[in-house]
Amino acid sequence: MRNKGFTLIELMVVLVILGVLAAMIAPKIMDRPDEARIVAARQDIATVIQALKMYRLDNIRYPTTEQGLQALVTKPAIAPIPDNWKSGGYLEKLPKDPWGNAYVYLNPGRHGDIDVISLGTDGESGGEGKDADIGSWML
């Protein structure tokens, strides 16, 4: 008469199957945080671009590179001083990119009138794959 239960071989087969499944799924799960950070950076850049457009509507021009994105939070003290700067600013505070770095602002931009750039995972200009820059021209 056979006992009810699993043999050692049956348990080993199940463990091997679970191991194979884990090996296939783990890399996909591990890449998700980087993908989420890239999406968050794109959303931040889109928000900053909208604030820059509002600044331009009020002041005829975008802030200069020297004035930087800080011009969206506090009225610039560097020429050209905006005449119609909105009380309270255009952003409550400047966001940092998902890797903790400041966004780079260029006026004129290399890819359009203005560029807003996250330097990506490595925090350095350029790079490929996960280290690639994320820019406003990519939206």
Predicted regions and their residues:
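Acidic, glycine-rich loop-and-strand cores that form catalytic or ligand-binding grooves
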Residues: 69-87
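A generic structural-conservation signal
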Residues: 10, 65-66, 81
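N-terminal single-pass transmembrane signal-anchor helix
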Residues: 2-29
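Compositionally biased, charge-rich terminal segments
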Residues: 57-59, 76-77
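Short, surface-exposed interaction loops/tails
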Residues: 31, 35-39, 50-53, 59, ...
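Hydrophobic positions in long alpha-helices of the protein kinase catalytic C-lobe
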Residues: 41-45
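Generic N-terminal leader/processing signal
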Residues: 1-2, 26, 35, 40
